[in-house]
């Protein structure tokens, strides 16, 4: 396992124990970076207006389309570190 992957997995664990709950925009960014790092570009249709949470998550993830997994992992690590 690469050093980046190990640091990413540690950041994922650390994200569950942050001193304060991040605001919704930051939570969406955390979600999107995690999904981009672990699954790649978003796939499937954008959720409809009745699923506001799903739609916001999809939009955040879609905003990272084309970002490499390594870049998304590093951005995720940096974001979690800044929230500690």
What residue ranges belong to the model's regions?
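A charge-rich, low-complexity, intrinsically flexible signal that marks solvent-exposed coils, linkers
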Residues: 1-84
